[in-house]
Amino acid sequence: MMARSRQAVRNRAVWFVLAGAYSATAGAQTRTAQAPSTGAEVRVQVNAASAHQVMEGFGATTVPLIYQNGADDKLPPALRTRALEAVYRDVRLTLGNVSMGQWEPQNDDADPMHLNEAALEVAGLRATNDKLLAPARALGADGLYPGNVVSLWATEWLKPIRASDYNRYLDECAEYVVSAVLKWRDVTGEIPRYQHLFNEALYGNVELRGSSPKEITDIVKRAGARLRSAGMPTTFIIASEYSPALSAAEARAVLSDPDARQYVGAIGYHPYPYESPYASMENILAGPGMGRPDANAVADRRALRDLGRQYNVPVWMTEVSHGGLDPRSMDALRARAIEIHDELAYADASAFFAMHAIWDSKSNTEHFGAARSLLKEEDTVVLIEIGTSSVLITGTGYAIGHYARWVQRGALRVESVSDDSLVMVSAFTDKKRGKASFVIINNADTAKTVRVHVSGLAFTGPLEGEQSEGDVRWKALGAVPTTEATGDEFAVTVPAKSVTSLGGTF
């Protein structure tokens, strides 16, 4: 209960920045690979013909750090530019649910079928477009979308309507959702592919307190139908509940209704509570980082995977926070790299999100108090210290970069099996671009030579790569040659407790 209370307090505070039944399991463990090898060489088999999910990308909740409907910008222009370059050029996030403030702080009018645009925070959206969206798009972020979730925190005026007239309440929710998509199109010139519809609506934050899976489903249907009548193809990211199991239950209720299902673009989930096997960085390092992933956590993710397969809907991991380690440390980087590997492997997650894309020291002090260190935001991708004009890519940011810098939208995750449970390998093929990529995590205390055989393709030349270990981040590697005769195998030395990314053409 303490963890959930802390979650609600923290996320409610962060929500005010934006606006102006899981239990940790310590039971059985499961292994997904062989025991740690006693020799120095690790063998990895990759089957390029055995495809899993299509990758969508990497992202984060995106706070513009512009408040009061655009009047209060926390970041000096040069510092903002550096921060955005770190997020979108260097780490290479492409996705993000973007805060739009309260958006509709008071009901626009009494008719949910008539939109009074004067009541919307369009000025704030214009400022966000000028200072965040347009620069981010220029740097490659082509998957940003409205994050004005349906929440009684953001729209308290909905409460009496909900209590007195449920049908009108659904229409008001639909108007709220559709207005954001329409104005996003008008201001940015782009129709968003997605809309983040809910965030911990029933559990954790409980942003729709007193709601039910039926109400969630009704909102999806009403808002989706109104979007289509407005000519908008935007689909919804649903669930994003407190834990994988709770997210699966909520998503199952929505997807079982064919009228609602047609509007769903992805199933979102969170990995909480904070002590869970994949939220806590220490638990990650002690569990899957030692070759012992938690069996219940794996089962929950496989249930999400199976649900997505059943309805042909992608699965996204849409938030993680409270890792608990210094964001400057290699342990923090390696822990989140392990989590990404496992979310992709067990849930077939097509997207992985950090907590926030950017966060700054002024906002941190104003909303959490001066005693709270900016470094406590360890799962935000880039931290900005305004007093020293410094921009820090966190361990979580570097971990995401080890994947995002090498894996583009449309790539396929393919089957990879390591004969050492301390050496984890994710493999991807991208037929459109003729590239294959690999992320290798060595959790052992010693360096390893990793020999990778790829069946089903032949490389046209050597691979290139980068490596993180100790205090070094994304260090460029020399050319990694492939076998001359067949071009389907390569070997690379990976230091102890390191993360390595490699890519080559085929």
Where are these regions (language model features)?
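Carbohydrate-binding surface patches
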Residues: 418-461
